C-alpha cells in the first residue's frame, strides 16, 4: 500500500489492537468485516481483561466478568466474519495497565512482538494515541514499541473511541499531524451492530447488581455505528 494513497481494503495481513473487548467492534468493526469478506488475514490483540466495568457486582466478580468479556469478544469477531481468525488475550488489568518498562509491560510487549513477527502485517489498526482513556493511550505506546522492536513497518491507522465525548483540546490531532481516512462501512454496518450486541455486558442490564457499572450510552453507540468509520494516519 502506497503511503500517498492508502486503501485499507488493499491490506493483506492486518493487526488490530483493542484496549478492551468491544473496542475492536466500536473502533474498527466495519472495516474488519469488510476485510474478512475479502479473505484477508487478521490477528486481534486484546490488551486488558475488561474486568473493571462492574467493580461492585457480587454475582460477577472480576475473574468471572473477564471470562465473560472474552466470550463476548469471540462472539463479536464471529459476527464480523472473523470467527476463525487468531486472537490473543493479554489479560492485563483493566484501567491499570503496567507501567512502561516494568517486567509485566515488557512481557506483554514481547508477546505482541511475537505476534507481529509471525503475522508481518501490512496494516496495523491501533487506538488513537491521545484517546482520553488511560488504556487506549498506554495501548498505543505498547503497540508502537512492539512494532519498532519487531522491525515491522506497516501502514498504521488509529481509531478514537472517546475523543469526541471526553477529549480536551490538546487530545485532538494537531494541524498537519495526521491525515483523516474515511472508510465506507455501509456494506458491513449491520454486521458491526450485531457484533456490538454480542457485548451485552457493556450495552444492556445483563449484569444488574451494580448501579455504578459502566454502560455504553445510546448516543455513543449511535455515533460509532454509522455508515462511515474515521481513522487517522500519521502524515508523511
Range-by-range predicted roles:
Residues 1-17, 38, 60-65, 78-88, ...:
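Metal-dependent de-N-acetylase/amidase catalytic core
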Residues 24-33, 76, 182, 232-234:
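Generic detector of contiguous secondary-structure segments
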Residues 3, 10-21, 25-64:
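ATP-dependent adenylation/pyrophosphate-handling site
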Residues 69-73:
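Generic hydrophobic, amphipathic alpha-helix propensity
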Amino acid at each position: 500500500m502506497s503511503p500517498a494513497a492508502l486503501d485499507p481494503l488493499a491490506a493483506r495481513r492486518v493487526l488490530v489492537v483493542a484496549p478492551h473487548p468491544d473496542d475492536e467492534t466500536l473502533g474498527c468493526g466495519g472495516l474488519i468485516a469488510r476485510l474478512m469478506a475479502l479473505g484477508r488475514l487478521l490477528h486481534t490483540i486484546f490488551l486488558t481483561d475488561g474486568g473493571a466495568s462492574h467493580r461492585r457486582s457480587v454475582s460477577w466478580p472480576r475473574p468471572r466478568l473477564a471470562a465473560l468479556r472474552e466470550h463476548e469478544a469471540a462472539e463479536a469477531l464471529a459476527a464480523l466474519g472473523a470467527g476463525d481468525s487468531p486472537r490473543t488475550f493479554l489479560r492485563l488489568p483493566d484501567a491499570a495497565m503496567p507501567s512502561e518498562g516494568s517486567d509485566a509491560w515488557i512481557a506483554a510487549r514481547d508477546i505482541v512482538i511475537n505476534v507481529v513477527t509471525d503475522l508481518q502485517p501490512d496494516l496495523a489498526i491501533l487506538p488513537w494515541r491521545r484517546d482520553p482513556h488511560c488504556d487506549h493511550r498506554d495501548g498505543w505506546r505498547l503497540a508502537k514499541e512492539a512494532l519498532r522492536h519487531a522491525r515491522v513497518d506497516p501502514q498504521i491507522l488509529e481509531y478514537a473511541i472517546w475523543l469526541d465525548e471526553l477529549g480536551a483540546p490538546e487530545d485532538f490531532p494537531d494541524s498537519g499531524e495526521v491525515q483523516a481516512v474515511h472508510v465506507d462501512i455501509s456494506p458491513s454496518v449491520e454486521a458491526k451492530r450485531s457484533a456490538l450486541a454480542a457485548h451485552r455486558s457493556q450495552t444492556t442490564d445483563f449484569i444488574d447488581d451494580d448501579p455504578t457499572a459502566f454502560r455504553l450510552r445510546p448516543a455513543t453507540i449511535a455515533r460509532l455505528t454509522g455508515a462511515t468509520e474515521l481513522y487517522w494516519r500519521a502524515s508523511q
